[in-house]
């Protein structure tokens, strides 16, 4: 009897733990069981236990109901993303009851605490006075993500503060760092990436800092290279510094004319003016320095006078290699700027004209600039009677490189019938977007040599992407053309691949035709 009672109690307990849907089925099954039991009297077990006996057969189904496999996982991920979007600006959201069960991974559950007051045991007042934002935090999560936070909350000198003020970090950058720590997600934007890098460096979050540097290297251009150079030195990022110098050297005139150049500090200004490899006319360097001086006067609340411009430039003025300017540039530009003293102007004029040159404080040796490299894609060239005429049609080829380079121009063939003049329109495109073009004339001497035709400014080329090089030539004479073209050419440390272009309407392709050379800086 005791054994029967224990069995009955166990069955009843199991039944009470079942979902309602299973209980309902149990009742129906019990009725059938009672009917058969009364008629045959073959079973002495309580009717309710009939369903318990089949519980093992339903175990898989119940587990599937409790732990769905595919659909809930997607919806969970979607809801987490939606929650993140809301939580960037709203930190007072209260999760649904039993929210832990909605997210299968610790990463997703941890992400629910991002910018959330729930269980927060510390708050940060982030940003400068007048632009602060109060953000919640959880000491354990922060300490796991940053050694600085660990020392702050659990170290020997830890202070038990409920509120911590951080005036030197922008709220958006601090949130980006918190999102990485809580959610293991990197969310960077062009307007906040530098501030995020500062935060990642300050709180020693190295993987986020590396992601910021990669983002900056990818978005590096002549427009922002000078500012990023200044910041890379501040953050002690030598790789980023080197990338900045590569852009500034190759696209010096674009970089010097950019608005960002005027935002650099004095130390960076000196570094750029001292640079031996700048590919720029010295008059452009001079004008850029004056533009910087004007903005610096505004930063120092000084009147925009010639005296103050010279004052803020200081000794950096003598890093400009004024004696190396073309005489016309000096006479019409620097000499009339008012920045030079009368004695300096007279001495520089004498430097240009006199046999006995005066001593100058300015550097009188021209910059070396960068030496252009040439990628020649044909193994031979030829000419045949009535073989290659232009007639205003387009010769085009596509190419890709494995390292960032700067295309300065193309090397083109000339006349095979003696000296001749050609009009050339050169163009460089990426996915149909024109990146650079120029219209110029060049003379050929009848030889099979190539003749350079330059873009106004070198064009930055990113690796592993095909670009289209095109030229439309206008000339009456027959021209040389290339033969035995190569699909891949090694030029120093740069590998260049070639393929045919659909823009080519004059016969140029990989195996033969025109545009024999790419001229570039690397």
UniProtKB/Swiss-Prot annotation:
Which InterPro entries does this UniProt record tie to the protein?
Answer: BACK (IPR011705), BTB/POZ_dom (IPR000210), PHR (IPR012983), PHR_sf (IPR038648), SKP1/BTB/POZ_sf (IPR011333)
Indicate the segments forming the BTB domain, all copies: 120-190
Keyword Cytoplasm set for record: yes
CDD domains xref list: BACK_BTBD3, BTB_POZ_BTBD3
Q: Which residues form a coiled coil?
A: none
Q: Which residues cross the membrane?
A: none
Keyword Nucleus assigned: yes
The region called Disordered is annotated at 25-44
Identify the Gene3D superfamilies for this entry: 1.25.40.420, PHR domain, Potassium Channel Kv1.1, Chain A
* Cellular location(s): Cytoplasm, Cytosol; Nucleus
Q: What GO cellular component is one of the record's annotations?
A: nucleus
**Molecular function (Gene Ontology), one example:** identical protein binding
Q: Which GO terms describe its biological process?
A: cerebral cortex development; dendrite morphogenesis; neurogenesis
Checking SMART domains in the record gives: BACK, BTB
Q: Where is the composition biased (Low complexity)?
A: 32-44
Q: Recite the UniProt keywords alphabetically.
A: Cytoplasm, Neurogenesis, Nucleus
Q: Where is the BACK domain?
A: 235-300
Q: What does this protein do?
A: Acts as a key regulator of dendritic field orientation during development of sensory cortex. Also directs dendrites toward active axon terminals when ectopically expressed.
Q: What is this protein called?
A: BTB/POZ domain-containing protein 3
């Amino acid at each position: 009897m005791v054994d029967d009672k224990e069995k009955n109690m166990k069955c009843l307990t199991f039944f009470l733990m079942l979902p309602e849907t299973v209980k309902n089925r149990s009742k129906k099954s019990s009725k059938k069981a009672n009917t058969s039991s009364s008629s045959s009297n073959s079973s002495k077990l309580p009717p309710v236990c009939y369903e318990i006996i089949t519980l093992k057969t339903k175990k898989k189904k119940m587990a599937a109901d409790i732990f769905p496999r595919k659909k809930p996982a997607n919806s969970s991920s979607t809801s987490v993303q939606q929650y993140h979007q809301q939580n960037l600006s709203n930190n007072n959201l209260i999760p649904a009851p039993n929210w832990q069960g909605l997210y299968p991974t610790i990463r997703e559950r941890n992400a629910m605490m991002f910018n959330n007051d729930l269980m927060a045991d510390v708050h940060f007042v982030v940003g400068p006075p007048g632009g602060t934002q109060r953000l919640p935090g959880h000491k354990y999560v922060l300490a796991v993500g940053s050694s600085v936070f660990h020392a702050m909350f659990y170290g020997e000198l830890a202070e038990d503060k409920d509120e911590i003020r951080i005036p030197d970090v922008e709220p958006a950058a601090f949130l980006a760092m918190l999102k990485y720590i809580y959610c293991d997600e990197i969310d960077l934007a062009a307007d906040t990436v530098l501030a995020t890098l500062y935060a990642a460096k300050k709180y020693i979050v190295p993987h986020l800092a590396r992601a910021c540097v990669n983002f900056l290297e990818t978005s590096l251009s002549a427009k922002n290279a000078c500012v990023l150079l200044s910041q890379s030195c501040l953050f002690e990022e030598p790789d980023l510094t080197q990338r900045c110098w590569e852009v500034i050297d190759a696209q010096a005139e674009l970089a010097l004319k950019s608005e960002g150049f005027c935002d650099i500090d004095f130390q960076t200004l000196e570094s750029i003016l001292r640079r031996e490899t700048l590919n720029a006319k010295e008059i452009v360097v001079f004008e850029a320095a004056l533009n910087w001086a004007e903005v610096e006067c505004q930063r120092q609340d000084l009147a925009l006078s010639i005296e103050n411009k010279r004052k803020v430039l200081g000794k950096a003025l003598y890093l400009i290699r004024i004696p190396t300017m073309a005489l016309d540039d000096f006479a019409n530009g620097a000499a009339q700027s008012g920045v030079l003293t009368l004695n300096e102007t007279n001495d520089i004029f004498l430097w240009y004209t006199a046999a006995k040159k005066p001593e100058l404080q300015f550097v009188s040796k021209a910059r070396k600039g960068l030496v252009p490299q040439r990628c020649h894609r044909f193994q031979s060239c030829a000419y045949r009677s009535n073989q290659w005429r232009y007639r205003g049609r387009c010769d085009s080829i596509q190419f890709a490189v494995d390292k960032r380079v700067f295309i300065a121009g193309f090397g083109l063939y000339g006349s095979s019938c003696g000296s001749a003049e050609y009009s050339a329109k050169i163009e460089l495109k990426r996915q149909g977007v024109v990146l650079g073009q120029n219209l110029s004339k060049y003379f050929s001497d009848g030889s099979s040599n190539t003749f350079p035709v330059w873009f106004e400014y070198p064009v930055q080329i990113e690796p592993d992407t095909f670009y289209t090089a095109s030229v439309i030539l206008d000339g009456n004479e027959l021209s040389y053309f290339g033969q035995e073209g190569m699909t891949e050419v090694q030029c120093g440390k740069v590998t260049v691949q070639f393929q045919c272009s659909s823009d080519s309407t004059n016969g140029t392709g990989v195996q033969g035709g025109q545009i024999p050379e790419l001229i570039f800086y690397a």
